[in-house]
C-alpha cells in the first residue's frame, strides 16, 4: 500500500511538471500531437527505490509507470506538445513555396482576365472610323508597294538576340532557393534578392541611357566638326586678309625678300611698269623705247604679236573688237615657254592647250574689268610677261584696232578714245611703231597709215608690216601693187623697213608650228620672191622679229641714259622742295602715313577702355537724368502730387513707374549709353595731343569714327536685362540711413530748382521786363506782355487767397478773372488766362514743394519709425530716392556693359574699318591729301624709277 501511494505521488509530480514546464525551446518548430496517441515514458521504474524527482528546465526524455492500472485520461487544456529532437523544416518550406506559387498563378490569371476586360471596354469606346477611310491618301493603303517589309524583317533582331533580352531563369531559381531566409528581416537572402531585382532594372535603364548617349555623342561630334571647319574657314579668311595687306604694302621692310638676279629685259619691263603708273598719275609720258603695235581693226595685229611670242595667247574674234585695252607683252628668253601677269604668281604653260585657254580667258576678263561702265575701250594697261626658248627680248604694246565707224553697242566716243590712246603711245619720240596693214584689202581703205604718218612723218622709227600676203597674192590682179607697198611707194608714209608676213589661213584652231610651216612653204613657192618683187630678208615673222628686236635695243641704248638724267634732275628738285618746306619731318608717303594714323587711332581706342569706372558712371548718370528728368517731373511727380493723400500718391507713382519701366526706360537708357560711348570716342579721337598733333590725319580719323559708329550696334539683350534691374530698383522703397535721405533731398531740390528757374524764365518772357530792367536797360513791354502781366497779377491774388488751389481753373474762376480785368479796361481771352495760369500755378507749386522738401530734412526719424504725421508725409522724397537709386544702378550696369563688351566690340569695328580703308586706294587718296602727302608720293616714285633705271643701265653696260 505504501508503495502504491508513493508511486501515485510520483506520477502526479510528473504530470504537474509536464503541464507547467517552461523549458521548451522557442526556436524549435511546432508539431500538433494528441496526448492519447503517444506513450509517456518515465525514468523511474517500480522495481527501483522511489526517490525525489529532479526538477529540470526542459525535458529531454519522458517515461511511464508500467504497473499503473489503465484508466481514462483527461485531456489537458494545452492541445499542442513539442518534440525537441525532430526537425521538419524541409516539409514546412515546401508547403510555403506551394502556397506562394498558387498565389502568383492566381494573381497572374486574375490580372490577365482583368486586363483583357479593360482592353475590350476601351476598344468599345473607340468610334468606328471605317466610314472615313476616304480621307486617308491612297499612298497609305499602298504603302506595302513602296516599303520592303522583307528587308525590315531581316533588320530586326533574330531569336538569339531575343534570348539575350529574356529574363535569366537561373537567377530566378537562385532567388527562390533563398526564400528560406526571405521572411527573416535583414537576412542575406533578402539582400541578394533585392540586389538582383535592382540589377535587372538597372540593365534596362542602362540600355535606354546608352542609346540616348549615342545620339547625344553623335550630335556633339557633328557640332564639333562644324565648329572645327568654321575655325579653319575663319583662320583662312584672316590669313587671306593679312596677305592682301602685305601685297598692298610693297615697301614693308619687315619681310625679307630674296634678291634674285633678273634678266635685262625683265629689269627694263619693271622700269616701264613703274613709269606707266607714274605717267597715269601725273598725266605725263615717259620717253623710254617700246614697240607699239598699231593697225586697223582685224588687220592681224594680234596674230603678228602671237607669231613673235610663238603662242596663241590673245582672245580672238572674227570682225569683232577683242582688244579693249593696251596689253604690254615683255618677251624674254627662258628654258620653259610660260606666261605670267605682273600682279600674279601663276604661270601658264604655253605648251598646254588648257593653260592657253585659261590665259586667253584671263586676259579677256582683265580687259572687261578695266573698261568702265558706259565705255568700250580703256587706256589702262595689262602687263604680261612671256618667256620661252628662242624668243627675242623686247617689249611690245598691243593697242586696240583703229576703226572708222562706231557701230551699235559701242560707246559714242569709242573712235576718239582709240585715236587718243594710239597717239599717246606713238608720240613718244623713242617708241618703235609697228604699223600693221591688211594686204587683202584695198590700200585706199587704210586708216592707220595716215595716223602713223602724222606721228612719224620722216619714218625714222616706223616698221611697216603687210599681213595676209597669201590672200593678197590671190586677190590682187597686179602683183606690182604689192611691190609698191613693200617699197613704200603706195602709202603716203615712210618707214625704216617693210615686211610681208603670213599669219595663218584664218583658222583660230591652228597651232603656231602649223602657221610657221605654212608661211615658209608659201614664201618658198611665192611668185613674189621668184620674180624678186620681195627680198628674202623682208618676209616671214622670224625676220620681222629679229629686225624689231635689233631696232628696239638700239633705241634703248641711245635713250635710256638721257631718261635717267632727266629723272635725276626731277629727284633733286623734289628733295630741295621738301627740305625747304618740311625740314623737320620725315618723308612719309600715303601708305606710311596711313599706318602711322592707324596706330594712333588704335591707341586712342585703347585709352577709351582705360577710363575709370567712376568717370563712366558719372557721365552716364548725368546724361540719363538729363534725358528722363522731364518725363519724371512732368508725367510722374506733378500728376501724383495733385492727389489728396499719401496712399493715392504712392499708387499713382507705382502705376506710372511700372508703365515707364516696361515701355520707355530701358530703351532710353541704351540710347544714352550709346550716345555716351560715341561722345567719349569722339572726344578721344578729336582732342589735340599738344604740339605733336598732326592735322593731316583729321579727315581720316573723322571718317574712321563715322564708319565705326555706323557699323556698331548695341547688344540686343541689353534692354531685357536692364528692364528687370530697373524694375527691381524702383520697387524698393526702404531708405536705410540718414545719408541716403539727405542725398535724396539734395537731388530733389536740384531738380525742382532747375524747373523753377525754367518757369521763371518762361514767365519773364511772357510778361516782359520788370521795372528794374525797364529803368536800367531802357526796355519796354509790348501790348501782349502788358495783358499777360495784368492777368498774372490777378491770378496771383487768387492764389494768395487759396494756397491749396487745385491745378486747374474752374470755368466760373476764369469768368471772374476776365470780368475783373475788363473792369480795369483789359480785354483778355480765356485761352490766355489758362496759359498764364499754367505758368503761375507751376511756379507756386514748385516753391511749395521746395519748402516742403526743406521741412523733410528732419523727417527721416519719422519715416524710419513709421510715424503718421500729416505735416511730414515725405513720399515725394522717397520717390526721388527711388529715381536716384535707379539712375545709379542703371549707370553701373551700363558701365559694365560698356567696359566689358561694347568697347571691345567698337575696337573690333575700328580695326575692320581700318583694314577696309587700307585695301581701298581711292579712299586713302581721298582722306590723306595735301601738298606734303603729294610731295612725298612724288619723291617715292621718282626715287624708285631712278633706282631701277640706274640698275638697268649698269646691267646694260655689263652686257656690252
UniProtKB/Swiss-Prot annotation:
Ranges facing Mitochondrial matrix side: 88-96
Region annotation (G3 motif) ranges: 398-401
Keyword terms: Acetylation, Apoptosis, Coiled coil, Disulfide bond, GTP-binding, Hydrolase, Lipid-binding, Magnesium, Membrane, Metal-binding, Mitochondrion, Mitochondrion inner membrane, Nucleotide-binding, Transit peptide, Transmembrane, Transmembrane helix
EC class name: hydrolase
Residues of the site described as Cleavage at site S1: 194-195
Region (G5 motif): 501-504
Entry's Gene Ontology BP terms: apoptotic process; endocytosis; GTP metabolic process; intracellular distribution of mitochondria; membrane tubulation; mitochondrial fission; mitochondrial fusion; mitochondrial genome maintenance
Residue positions binding GTP: 298, 300-303, 317, 468, 470, 503
Residue ranges within the lipid bilayer that do not cross it: 771-781
Transit peptide endpoints, chain numbering: 1-87
Region (Paddle region): 736-856
Family, per entry: Belongs to the TRAFAC class dynamin-like GTPase superfamily. Dynamin/Fzo/YdjA family.
Stated name of the protein: Dynamin-like GTPase OPA1, mitochondrial
Gene source species: Pongo abelii (Sumatran orangutan)
Taxonomy of the source species: Eukaryota, Metazoa, Chordata, Craniata, Vertebrata
GN (gene name): OPA1
Amino acid at each position: 500500500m505504501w508503495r502504491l501511494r508513493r508511486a501515485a505521488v510520483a506520477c502526479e509530480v510528473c504530470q504537474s511538471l509536464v503541464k507547467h514546464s517552461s523549458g521548451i525551446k522557442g526556436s524549435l518548430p511546432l508539431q500538433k500531437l494528441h496526448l492519447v496517441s503517444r506513450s509517456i515514458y518515465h525514468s523511474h521504474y517500480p522495481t527501483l527505490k522511489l526517490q525525489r524527482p529532479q526538477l529540470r528546465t526542459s525535458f529531454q526524455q519522458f517515461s511511464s509507470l508500467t504497473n499503473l492500472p489503465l484508466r481514462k485520461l483527461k485531456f489537458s487544456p494545452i492541445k499542442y506538445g513539442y518534440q525537441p529532437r525532430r526537425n521538419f523544416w524541409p516539409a514546412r518550406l515546401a508547403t510555403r513555396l506551394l502556397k506562394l506559387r498558387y498565389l502568383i498563378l492566381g494573381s497572374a490569371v486574375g490580372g490577365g482576365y482583368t486586363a483583357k476586360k479593360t482592353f475590350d471596354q476601351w476598344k468599345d469606346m473607340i468610334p468606328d472610323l471605317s466610314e472615313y477611310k476616304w480621307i486617308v491618301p491612297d499612298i497609305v493603303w499602298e504603302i506595302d508597294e513602296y516599303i520592303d517589309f522583307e528587308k525590315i524583317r531581316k533588320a530586326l533582331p533574330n531569336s538569339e538576340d531575343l534570348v539575350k533580352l529574356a529574363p535569366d531563369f537561373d537567377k530566378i531559381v537562385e532567388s527562390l532557393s533563398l526564400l528560406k531566409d526571405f521572411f527573416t528581416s535583414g537576412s542575406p537572402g533578402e539582400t541578394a534578392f533585392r540586389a538582383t531585382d535592382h540589377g535587372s532594372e538597372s540593365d534596362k535603364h542602362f540600355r535606354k541611357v546608352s542609346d540616348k548617349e549615342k545620339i547625344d555623342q553623335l550630335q556633339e561630334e557633328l557640332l564639333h566638326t562644324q565648329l572645327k571647319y568654321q575655325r579653319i574657314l575663319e583662320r583662312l579668311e584672316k590669313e587671306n586678309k593679312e596677305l592682301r595687306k602685305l601685297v598692298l604694302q610693297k615697301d614693308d621692310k619687315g619681310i625679307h625678300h630674296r634678291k634674285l638676279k633678273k634678266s635685262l629685259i625683265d629689269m627694263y619691263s619693271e622700269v616701264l611698269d613703274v613709269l606707266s603708273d607714274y605717267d597715269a598719275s601725273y598725266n605725263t609720258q615717259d620717253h623710254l623705247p617700246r614697240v607699239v603695235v598699231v593697225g586697223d581693226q582685224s588687220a592681224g595685229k594680234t596674230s603678228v604679236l602671237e607669231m613673235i611670242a610663238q603662242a596663241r595667247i590673245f582672245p580672238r574674234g572674227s570682225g569683232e573688237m577683242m582688244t579693249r585695252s593696251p596689253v604690254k607683252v615683255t618677251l624674254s628668253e627662258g628654258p620653259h615657254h610660260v606666261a605670267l601677269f605682273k600682279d600674279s604668281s601663276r604661270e601658264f604653260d604655253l605648251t598646254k592647250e588648257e593653260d592657253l585657254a585659261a590665259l586667253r580667258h584671263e586676259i579677256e576678263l582683265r580687259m572687261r574689268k578695266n573698261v568702265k561702265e558706259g565705255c568700250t575701250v580703256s587706256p589702262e594697261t595689262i602687263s604680261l610677261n612671256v618667256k620661252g626658248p628662242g624668243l627675242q627680248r623686247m617689249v611690245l604694246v598691243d593697242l586696240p584696232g583703229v576703226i572708222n565707224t562706231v557701230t551699235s553697242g559701242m560707246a559714242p566716243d569709242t573712235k576718239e578714245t582709240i585715236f587718243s590712246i594710239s597717239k599717246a603711245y606713238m608720240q613718244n619720240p623713242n617708241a618703235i611703231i609697228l604699223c600693221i596693214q591688211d594686204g587683202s584689202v584695198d590700200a585706199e581703205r587704210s586708216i592707220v597709215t595716215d595716223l602713223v604718218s602724222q606721228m612719224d612723218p620722216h619714218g625714222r622709227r616706223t616698221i611697216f608690216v603687210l599681213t595676209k600676203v597669201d590672200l593678197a597674192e590671190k586677190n590682187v590682179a597686179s602683183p606690182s601693187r604689192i611691190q609698191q607697198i613693200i617699197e613704200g611707194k603706195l602709202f603716203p608714209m615712210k618707214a625704216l623697213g617693210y615686211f610681208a608676213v603670213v599669219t595663218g589661213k584664218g583658222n583660230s584652231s591652228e597651232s603656231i608650228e602649223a602657221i610657221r610651216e605654212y608661211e615658209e612653204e608659201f614664201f618658198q613657192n611665192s611668185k613674189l620672191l621668184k620674180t624678186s618683187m620681195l627680198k628674202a630678208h623682208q618676209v616671214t615673222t622670224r625676220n620681222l622679229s629679229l629686225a624689231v628686236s635689233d631696232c628696239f635695243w638700239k633705241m634703248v641704248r641711245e635713250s635710256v641714259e638721257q631718261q635717267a638724267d632727266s629723272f635725276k634732275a626731277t629727284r633733286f628738285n623734289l628733295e630741295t622742295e621738301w627740305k625747304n618746306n618740311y625740314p623737320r619731318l620725315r618723308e612719309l608717303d600715303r601708305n606710311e602715313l596711313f599706318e602711322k594714323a592707324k596706330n594712333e587711332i588704335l591707341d586712342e581706342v585703347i585709352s577709351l577702355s582705360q577710363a575709370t569706372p567712376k568717370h563712366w558712371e558719372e557721365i552716364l548718370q548725368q546724361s540719363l537724368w538729363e534725358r528722363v528728368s522731364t518725363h519724371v517731373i512732368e508725367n510722374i511727380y506733378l500728376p501724383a502730387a495733385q492727389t489728396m493723400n499719401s496712399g493715392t500718391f504712392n499708387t499713382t507713382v507705382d502705376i506710372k513707374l511700372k508703365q515707364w519701366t516696361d515701355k520707355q526706360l530701358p530703351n532710353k537708357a541704351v540710347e544714352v549709353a550709346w550716345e555716351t560711348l560715341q561722345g567719349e570716342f569722339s572726344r578721344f579721337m578729336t582732342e589735340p595731343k599738344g604740339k605733336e598733333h598732326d592735322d593731316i590725319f583729321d579727315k581720316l580719323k573723322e571718317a574712321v569714327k563715322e564708319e565705326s559708329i555706323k557699323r556698331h550696334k548695341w547688344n540686343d539683350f541689353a534692354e531685357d536685362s536692364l528692364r528687370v534691374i530697373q524694375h527691381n530698383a524702383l520697387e524698393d522703397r526702404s531708405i536705410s540711413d540718414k545719408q541716403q535721405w539727405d542725398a535724396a533731398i539734395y537731388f530733389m531740390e536740384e531738380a525742382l530748382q532747375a524747373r523753377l528757374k525754367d518757369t521763371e524764365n518762361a514767365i519773364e518772357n511772357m510778361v516782359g521786363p520788370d521795372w528794374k530792367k525797364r529803368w536800367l536797360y531802357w526796355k519796354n513791354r509790348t501790348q501782349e506782355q502788358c495783358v499777360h502781366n495784368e492777368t498774372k497779377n490777378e491770378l496771383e491774388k487768387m492764389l494768395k487767397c487759396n494756397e491749396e488751389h487745385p491745378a486747374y481753373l474752374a470755368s466760373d474762376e476764369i469768368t471772374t478773372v476776365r470780368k475783373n480785368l475788363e473792369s480795369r479796361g483789359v480785354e483778355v481771352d480765356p485761352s490766355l488766362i489758362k496759359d498764364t495760369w499754367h505758368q503761375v500755378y507751376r511756379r507756386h507749386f514748385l516753391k511749395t514743394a521746395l519748402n516742403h522738401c526743406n521741412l523733410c530734412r528732419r523727417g527721416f526719424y519719422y519715416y524710419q519709425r513709421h510715424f503718421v504725421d500729416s505735416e511730414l508725409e515725405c513720399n515725394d522724397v522717397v520717390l526721388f530716392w527711388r529715381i536716384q537709386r535707379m539712375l545709379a544702378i542703371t549707370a553701373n550696369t551700363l558701365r559694365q556693359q560698356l567696359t566689358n563688351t561694347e568697347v571691345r566690340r567698337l575696337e573690333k569695328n575700328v580695326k575692320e574699318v581700318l583694314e577696309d580703308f587700307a585695301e581701298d586706294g581711292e579712299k586713302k587718296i581721298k582722306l590723306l591729301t595735301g601738298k606734303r602727302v603729294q610731295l612725298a608720293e612724288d619723291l617715292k616714285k621718282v626715287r624708285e624709277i631712278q633706282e631701277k633705271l640706274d640698275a638697268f643701265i649698269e646691267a646694260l653696260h655689263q652686257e656690252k
